[in-house]
Amino acid sequence: MNRLQAKKAVNVSRHEQKRIRYKLTPEEVKAERKERKRRAAIQRAEKKLIRAKGEALVAFQAVSNPSCNFLVIDFEAYEFNQKIITEAGITMRINGEWDYHHYRIKNFLHLRNGRFVPDEADNFQFGDSKIVTKIAFISILKKILKTPNLHLVGHGVENEIKYANVLGIPIPKDVTVLDTQNVFSFFQSLFLKEISNSNNISLAKMLTHLNIRAFCLHNAGNDARYTSEALREMTNKFTLSNF
């Protein structure tokens, strides 16, 4: 018997010893293993919920504080090359006033989605789209990121930060980052009485849960606007007693 065979024999022997010790059938051992996995999944969900609660509290306090500024951002990338940013949606609250913007990158107007992702580039619902060069947009976003007391919000915000990095735009360390997926996870546990093992709910599904009618999603400007609406809808229902 070689070492590998001996190791396998020891493992089988230990498994058999446990089964015999507790007089468990193979089916009971399988059920026990399944139950352990279920409990572990619940523990992971509860840990995520604790983090989501903290993020929801920050969002609640910031939205209710007029001195807090917001940048809600969404990028659309070319479906055949995720390093090519074709659109950007920017919703801002600066000095208490909300503004909604949709930028299309002039360098890539000829690149259209539509095979895997809906092509809604022409369908901004909250104003006129602005066509700018990539360099001009980078300058615009960098300037916004210098706003004091700024909170950066995104739905799946890590993806938006990744796209910003693709453009060569780092997020300043003094900017507070909020993810509406996490805020919704806490909102869901509180008001919908559901605890999800995943925070990865789509924007469309979250808006449906919040009874927000949305049109032409996958237009970056619309997505940023609806993300801001979702954030406000959720935080408006929170009270300090929820935390």
UniProtKB/Swiss-Prot annotation:
InterPro entries: Gfd2/YDR514C-like, Gfd2/YDR514C-like_C, RNaseH-like_sf, RNaseH_sf. Its main location: nucleus. GO terms for cellular component: nucleolus; nucleus. Keywords: Nucleus. It is found in: Nucleus, Nucleolus. Signal peptide: none annotated. Pfam families: DEDDh_C (PF21762). It comes from the Eukaryota. GO terms for molecular function: nucleic acid binding. This is Uncharacterized nucleolar protein C2C4.08. It comes from Schizosaccharomyces pombe (strain 972 / ATCC 24843) (Fission yeast). The lineage of its organism: Eukaryota, Fungi, Dikarya, Ascomycota, Taphrinomycotina.
